[in-house]
Amino acid sequence: VPDLLNLARRVLEQATADEEVEVYVSHGRETSVRVFEGAIEQLETAESAGVGVRVISAGRQGFSYVGALDEPAAKEALIEARDNARFATVDEHAGLASPDGVEPPVLDLWREELVSFPTDDRVALALELERRVRSGDSRIRQVVSSDYVDGFGETAIATSRGIEVTDRQTGCYLFVHAVAGDGDDTQTGFGYSVGRAPGELDLEAAAVDAVDRATRLLGARKARSAKLTAVLDRRVTATLLGILSGTLSGEEVV
């Protein structure tokens, strides 16, 4: 994989004096494993890469994208974006941002361990999670799915106004969905663990959480009606906040 920022710079070198150019370069990969009853049910890996170019000339904007990271293709995207701008409607407010002089924060979001993590080890984590849930309680009747998912992404942005930024991050998670039963009563529950690298995942915590949530309401009975203080589960609270934040987002009125 070429240096993303250097690729963006080389595209910018082709910009003319009467236009503004923004180049976005990205590369990423995602792998997912699902197991069921001790065997692999699904194993997928998807990799993406590309260069996006925006050109602003005489108040007209043109865009183009190419799904490759080689320099000739990236430069061709600039030519296409330039050509597309010729047919765009004039927007007197169109323009690129100027550097504000503020250094972006340095965030520790990348773990090299994940990028080179063997596929066999990914499968092993999903299988072990399923095994722990099954053995966690005799009332567990089935593990619907046990998943391991990871991915990484790298991006670079460079503009003719002098902005240059890069970002890269990794992430992974384990997720398990279990069904528990006692007589005719059946309940479900799930557990998960997230991290920047496989070594940061907590198998035991995910398994225990799934077993607990699947079994704790077995045999439960409806409570009498009353005015009481409601204590919300943290996941329920997060869901409610997610709904509210979406409705209050400025993007809803743009």
Predicted regions and their residues:
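Active-site bordering "gate/hinge" segments
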Residues: 1-254
